[in-house]
């Protein structure tokens, strides 16, 4: 699904009073920057329209940023990502948005959330799945950046770990971490370990007793 964010060039920059008036009209000040632009652009967003899109996207969601000037003439249409969002400390409303505009033919580095698929066998057996990293940094061309990295944990047993090298990635995407870094593990609960140890000790005990009796008989 394509997400299109519409914005207008903002002529008033750096004037706090003007920015407050802007927010009072139901608008959100924003800025766009990055190697895909000759210079940063000061923008204004329609609050209602932006929030409809914002609740469905993440930092790694590709957006089509469409910018128009005061005469409603389109001056920019480019792939972009949300780089940063500032919130009001009291109301928690969006106060400002930063858009990152990458170069089309150069790889970029961006954090992508992990999405767990399936239920681990180890969890079915009583283990606890521990997610070490909820998101990972990836390198890819802007149009190849995935919204999420899906990881199937179905075959993960008790005590097993899933590392960066085990992840199946889309073509043209690489995780910018060490191959041996652990992403997910199924921890064996202490009670489960004790139970297994007790069973082993019990099964070995009769052999020790029998062996002792045989030695006494030989004497």
UniProtKB/Swiss-Prot annotation:
SUPFAM superfamilies linked: Ribosomal protein L25-like
GO molecular function, one term: 5S rRNA binding
GO CC, alphabetical: cytosolic large ribosomal subunit
CDD domains on file: Ribosomal_L25_TL5_CTC (cd00495)
Alphabetical list of InterPro entries matching this protein: Rbsml_bL25/Gln-tRNA_synth_N, Ribosomal_bL25/Gln-tRNA_synth, Ribosomal_bL25_b-dom, Ribosomal_bL25_C, Ribosomal_bL25_long, Ribosomal_L25_dom, Ribosomal_uL5_bac-type
Keyword terms, alphabetized: Ribonucleoprotein, Ribosomal protein, RNA-binding, rRNA-binding
Compositional bias of kind Low complexity: 197-206
Keyword Ribosomal protein: yes
Family matches, as Pfam families: Ribosomal_L25p, Ribosomal_TL5_C
Region feature Disordered, mapped onto this chain: 195-219
Biased composition (Basic and acidic residues): 207-219
Gene3D superfamilies: Ribosomal protein L25, beta domain (2.170.120.20), Ribosomal Protein L25, Chain P (2.40.240.10)
Swiss-Prot/TrEMBL GO biological process terms: translation
Superkingdom of origin: Bacteria
Its biological purpose: This is one of the proteins that binds to the 5S RNA in the ribosome where it forms part of the central protuberance.
Subunit structure of this chain's protein: Part of the 50S ribosomal subunit; part of the 5S rRNA/L5/L18/L25 subcomplex. Contacts the 5S rRNA. Binds to the 5S rRNA independently of L5 and L18.
Family to which this protein belongs: Belongs to the bacterial ribosomal protein bL25 family. CTC subfamily.
Protein name: Large ribosomal subunit protein bL25
Species per Swiss-Prot/TrEMBL record: Fervidobacterium nodosum (strain ATCC 35602 / DSM 5306 / Rt17-B1)
Lineage, top ranks: Bacteria, Thermotogati, Thermotogota, Thermotogae, Thermotogales
Annotated gene: rplY
